[in-house]
Design a protein with these regions (language model features):
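RNA-contacting regions in translation and RNA-metabolism proteins
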Residues: 1-143
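Single conserved hydrophobic/aromatic residue that forms the stacking wall/gate
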Residues: 141-152
Length: 152
């Protein structure tokens, strides 16, 4: 058996970027790292039904930028932007600095593995037949997607 390599760490710098981009002075790293974990957990709980694929956090000096990649941006933004303002205020209290919130739409959710898995999970939670769900996912995502194979 060969050595096991983390696939995310293996691709960093080549085809993927870090999910958090910031620099911490000596003694502040632990605080900022725990803060990032808290923000990600909060957003996962708050945006459970919004099909969030990726959360990126950048920290320029004395501010923060949070980018949320989702296939349903309307659910996050809400009517007239009310929900996004509430979310921004909650994030500001958690992070302790002014937060700029950026919602990015994923044009082809069929190509995003995180969203495909979330869709399958939602169907299974609704007590759908698992073989039908898997077959439908494989057929749907291979026919629309540029990829030829799907492994579930």
């Amino acid at each position: 058996m060969g050595q096991k390599v983390n696939p995310v760490g293996f691709r960093l710098g080549i085809s993927r970027d870090h999910n958090s981009t910031w620099y911490a002075e000596k003694g502040k790293y632990q605080e900022l790292l725990l803060n990032d974990f808290a923000v990600r957990e909060f957003l996962k709980k708050e945006l459970d039904n919004s099909f969030v694929s990726k959360i990126e956090i950048e920290r320029p000096s004395e501010s923060a930028k949070v980018s949320i990649h989702t296939s349903r941006p309307g659910m996050i933004i809400g009517k007239k932007g009310e929900d996004i303002d509430k979310l921004r205020n909650k994030l500001t209290t958690i992070m302790g600095v002014p937060v700029s919130l950026n919602i990015k739409e994923i044009r082809k959710p069929d190509l995003d593995a995180q969203l495909v898995a979330a869709n399958i999970a939602v169907q299974l939670e609704k007590r759908a037949m698992f073989r039908r769900v898997i077959k439908r996912a494989c057929l749907l995502y291979t026919s629309d997607a540029a990829d030829e194979t799907v492994r579930v």
